[in-house]
């Protein structure tokens, strides 16, 4: 029961941080704002997150976990690699473009988010890589683990790149192209 309360409180704080960031922007959001929005004391917020930096990073990771959940749903009906990759890319690209906060932050205060997607990106990259390794492992056949890991890292890095700079072309076109390139590379390198 205590663990559930801790998880609920953590989620409440993250929801409050999201709402405050939408309302005030990331730079202007304070821990006091988050505490007020969550209807908790500042001390409670600080018990869960030692700094605003930690809170924003946790928020970034939670939003990435939401993308991953959406991608899992999208790829589930696709036992073959290419359609699964297309579904993964289309879902992620749409999710990134439709995210209520991402475009706003990238347009008005990119310096608040970019560190989590560049110099401090290892946890973000790791989550994306694990997702894509699952996709490749389940669908790529006899591809070496090293090549699978490299392809997964490439995909994760592309997702981060598209989060920072959206593609100029339609999501479906980008997804088809990326899936084609990856599948050709994997088949050729077997």
Across the structure, where does each feature detected by a protein language model lie?
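Basic, helix-initiating cap at the start of DNA-binding domains
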Residues: 1-24, 28-37, 54-57, 62-65
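Generic detection of well-ordered alpha-helical segments
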Residues: 7, 11, 15, 61, ...
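Amphipathic alpha-helical interface segments
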Residues: 16, 20, 44, 70, ...
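Short hydrophobic/aromatic patch on the recognition helix
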Residues: 38-49
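Hydrophobic alpha-helical connector segments
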Residues: 58, 72-98, 152
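Amphipathic alpha-helical packing segments from all-alpha helical-bundle domains
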Residues: 65-68, 113-153
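Amphipathic alpha-helical segments used for helix-helix packing
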Residues: 96-122
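Hydrophobic/aromatic-rich alpha-helical bundle segments in the mid-to-C-terminal region
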Residues: 104-107, 118, 138-182
